[in-house]
Amino acid sequence: MYKRSLIAASLSVAALVSAQAMAEINGGGATLPQQLYQEPGVLTAGFAAYIGAGSGNGKAAFLNNDYTKFVAGTTNKNVHWAGSDSKLSKTNETNPYLSAHGSAWGPLIQVPSVATSVALPFNKSGSNAVNFADVNTLCGVFSGRLTDWSQIPGSGRSGAITVAYRSESSGTTELFTRFLNASCSSALEGGTFAITTSFGNSFSGGLPAGAVSAQGSQAVMNTLNAAEGRITYMSPDFAAPTLAGLDDATKVAQVRGVSPAPANVSAAIGAVTPPTTAQRSDPNNWVPVFAATASATDPSVRPYPTTGYPILGFTNLIFSQCYADATQTQQVRDFFTRHYGASVNNDTAITNHRFVPLPASWKLAVRQSFLTSTNNLYIGHSNVCNGIGRPL
């Protein structure tokens, strides 16, 4: 009798542990913020460890509930959220998702998480600061027009330049190619840069000769450090191990005399206003993107700032408004409460990882929209999520 009771109790505990494991909130995607999201305490209770897989894989995992985009061969887990530096395309991603899954899973939420620079670390010995005082020089390096370090004025270096880049669908690549698209002269470069998550497909003239690639932020940094003469574009969290490292222009290039340190993008980010109340029901309006000029039809498109470090953008969060499990619904609210809190929040961790916390006006807009029970955008709103939601 005792043995049967012990077995029954063991089975009950095993079932409970299994249910708890299944109930974890699974997410992953962009590697730019990977180390931030893996910092203890940034993700709140109930969240599984963040999996860095690239923005493209993160979006695909969420949009199709396909966990294999995070871990190949694992088909018994659901995807509950994603991180992406690449904004969801309203036409190609958000609208098809709502058509295919909206009735069963509910609307999606897309909001900026932190602001970021895109740094330009390089591996070329020398004591001079490397400064792309003229953006055309930067464009020439990444188009392949300029092939030797001696062609970068003031660098005090010579030898072949080798561009290292992300091989997979990367949101960091999208942030970088947005800048190149807006800033580079087609007449000078002999081609144009397309805004894309695939650097290999960006420049119409093809990749620079000898360019090398790797998958993920850390792998690209390893590739960069494997041989002299290499340069890449990178998350500030991976480009340098410390905040002071971002200001070391013998290892991380300046652009127009400015380093990619957070202080050099915070003023520009502070000038970006959140969507108006009337605009907030459209996920597209929540994520600002930069371009040569503002758009008359898309309020999320803002002109690049004229001061400070110019290569910047946001890394974003993608969640559902509705989850089938009430516990998960509350856990998602708890994370939003923490991450977008007015006083108790993740700002210290964000700053320590060389990112820029969202301004108070943005955090307030998120709380008003997704954490206020009388707002139709409220996470788990009974009128929207009645009997539907992403699966446990």
Curated annotation (Swiss-Prot):
Gene3D superfamilies xref list: Periplasmic binding protein-like II
EC number of this enzyme: 3.1.3.1
Swiss-Prot/TrEMBL catalytic activity: a phosphate monoester + H2O = an alcohol + phosphate
Gene Ontology MF term list: alkaline phosphatase activity
Outcome following mutation: A53V: In strain: MDR25
Signal peptide (UniProt feature, chain positions): 1-23
UniProt xrefs under SUPFAM superfamilies: Periplasmic binding protein-like II
Pfam families: PBP_like_2 (PF12849)
Record keywords, A-Z: Hydrolase, Periplasm, Secreted, Signal
Other notes: Protein and DNA sequence from strain MDR1 in. DNA sequence from MDR25 in.
Subunit structure: Homodimer.
Name of the featured protein: Alkaline phosphatase L
